[in-house]
Amino acid sequence: MIKLGIRVANSINSGRGHFERCFSVSNYFTSKIFWFLDEKNSFYENRIKDKDEIIYEEEVTEVSSMAKAVSENKINIILLDSYNIDINSISKLFKNIPLCVFRDTSKFLNVQMVICPHPISLDNNKNIVSLSGPKFAPISSKYINNQLCKKNKNINLLISMGAYDSLGITLNIIKSIKKLTKKVEKKIIT
């Protein structure tokens, strides 16, 4: 039986994307899930199912509560989605159970599975399961099945690059779209 522990960044500085990815995955599990969060926040607490257990780590870089749960056999697989935690040191700490991570870079990780929702090639060895590309983005089905909505013959697009766009990717996308057509309504919401 899978006993899943999810260590996810939910601090104010991390944005909601990490939690949303893990929450989408959690909907596929009927068994109890142990959630290891950075800090208390009623928004996240209210979304996590009653059958699940929420445990708060002391710091955003901390995993001691999760390590305790592993030693007590409460969890036997870890899903990790946080930029604040050094994944390679985590993989050494939890070498006896599978470790699956969400990643947004192609950097090599010594884990059992890497999920990257971006269309990049991952630098992993053949012993690591690598799932890369938009089809592996855990998106809720309520968003996937939406119909294209046209207003006044204009096509409305939502471009979301997460909380931080230090490389200016959003503006590059908008510039590319502007070249394709003049019928695009542009709104940047941060």
Model-derived segments and their meaning:
Residues N110-L167:
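A nucleotide-sugar donor-handling region in carbohydrate enzymes
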